[in-house]
Amino acid sequence: MRRIDPNKLELEERVVAVNRVAKVVKGGRRLRFSALVVVGDKNGHVGFGTGKAQEVPEAIRKAIEDAKKNLIEVPIVGTTIPHEVIGHFGAGEIILKPASEGTGVIAGGPARAVLELAGISDILSKSIGSNTPINMVRATFDGLKQLKRAEDVARLRGKTVEELLG
């Protein structure tokens, strides 16, 4: 899969979660902050990243840099996705279903951020299992990576789109 250059895109950032984490040492606890950020151009490109630092803004900055390195391209048909898909990560699972125009983004928390920044405006989703933000974001990404356009599938099978769709 080819790398997407983040400098050519107008990316919007959204902080999904900021967590205070502690390392217990002999003298007490060392506190740091971890941040989960989703970036996207609302036109079929989206990425997520995590960052950890002693200060919240620094953690967010690191997460944004990380997110720009993990961009993926999402096939969008009109305002929705081409077909139904199930994304998995750990104990988290998310079902993504295409929806008719005007439905809106029906998704909870972290998944909503990913789908909106990907540029999908009509979709139904259901999160099952783990509801930790990082697991939900990764499961959503897994689902989005599985999506294929009808033209791509037809080319792989050596058929026309009409033959494929009947």
UniProtKB/Swiss-Prot annotation:
Q: Which GO terms of the molecular function aspect are on file?
A: rRNA binding; structural constituent of ribosome
Q: Where is the S5 DRBM domain?
A: 11-74
- Cellular component per GO? small ribosomal subunit
Q: Disulfide bonds, which pairs? A: none
InterPro entries for this protein: Ribosomal_Su5_D2-typ_SF (IPR020568), Ribosomal_uS5 (IPR000851), Ribosomal_uS5_bac-type (IPR005712), Ribosomal_uS5_C (IPR005324), Ribosomal_uS5_N (IPR013810), Ribosomal_uS5_N_CS (IPR018192), Ribsml_uS5_D2-typ_fold_subgr (IPR014721)
Which terms are listed as keywords in the entry?
Ribonucleoprotein, Ribosomal protein, RNA-binding, rRNA-binding
Pfam families recorded: Ribosomal_S5, Ribosomal_S5_C
**Stored HAMAP family:** Ribosomal_uS5_B (MF_01307_B)
Q: Which family does it belong to?
A: Belongs to the universal ribosomal protein uS5 family.
Give the quaternary structure.
Part of the 30S ribosomal subunit. Contacts proteins S4 and S8.
* Entries under NCBIfam families matching the protein: rpsE_bact
Q: Domain comment, in the record's words?
A: The N-terminal domain interacts with the head of the 30S subunit; the C-terminal domain interacts with the body and contacts protein S4. The interaction surface between S4 and S5 is involved in control of translational fidelity.
Instruction: Explain the purpose of this protein.
Output: With S4 and S12 plays an important role in translational accuracy.
What this protein is called in its record is Small ribosomal subunit protein uS5
Q: What species is given as this protein's source?
A: Geobacillus kaustophilus (strain HTA426)
